[in-house]
Amino acid sequence: MLHSLFRLTLLFYALFNALGSLPVFIALLKNFSFKKQQHIILRESIFALLLLLLFVTFGRGFFRLLGIILPAFQFTGSLLLGSIAIDMMKALPPQTETLERDKDEPIFFPLAFPVITGPAMITSTLGHMEEGIFPKKIVLGAIVLAWLFSLITLLLSSSINRLFGQMGLLALERLFGISLALMAGNLMLKALSTAFNIGYYVTP
């Protein structure tokens, strides 16, 4: 159980991509005081968690009503994960030029969604809840733990940026990208195995 919790927490933390989002937060919040920055990060992180829990709690029934099946979640999730992984492995810097021009305080968009909780995160958590390999309490626990670690990362953004520097952050992001790419491949194999009933077993 602890091993499953660790694996899911690592996956969800990579999907929150707090390290990769640091430049966006720094650019958006640089005109605010340190205390105000911490307040905004905490508020937007709470918004992001509530949004994710809302999808996890009620999203499954809604998508079932639309006739969307588990392999669709898995396949779409693998594509989204793969896309994020490619960007992370290339260590593409976020587009912050437009953000830097905006002096207004960001509320919900774009920090809570889609920077912290994005489509890939929503799809992945829904997929894990739907497939039932992991107990729901493990999935929910992993979501909260990953969110907490991401929040700590964002709150320490200034210190982390000074400690690792731009090159260090890019190296860490590439490392997470490689792990995420492997997870995406595993998820796609699961989707194909389920959809075509080819009998290929992929460990959860």
UniProtKB/Swiss-Prot annotation:
Swiss-Prot/TrEMBL keywords: Cell membrane, Membrane, Transmembrane, Transmembrane helix
Could you tell me which InterPro entries the record lists for this protein? Multi_antbiot-R_MarC
Q: How does it sit in the membrane?
A: Multi-pass membrane protein
The record's GO CC annotations read: plasma membrane
Instruction: Establish whether keyword S-adenosyl-L-methionine is in the entry.
Output: no
Q: Disulfide connectivity?
A: none
Where, subcellularly, is it found?
Cell membrane
Source species, domain of life: Bacteria
Q: Where is this protein primarily located? A: membrane
Fetch the Pfam families from UniProt: MarC
Query: Which residues span the membrane?
Result: 9-29, 39-59, 66-86, 107-127, 138-158, 176-196
> Does the keyword field hold Membrane?
yes
| Family from the record | Belongs to the UPF0056 (MarC) family.
Protein name (record): UPF0056 membrane protein CT_852
Origin organism is Chlamydia trachomatis serovar D (strain ATCC VR-885 / DSM 19411 / UW-3/Cx)
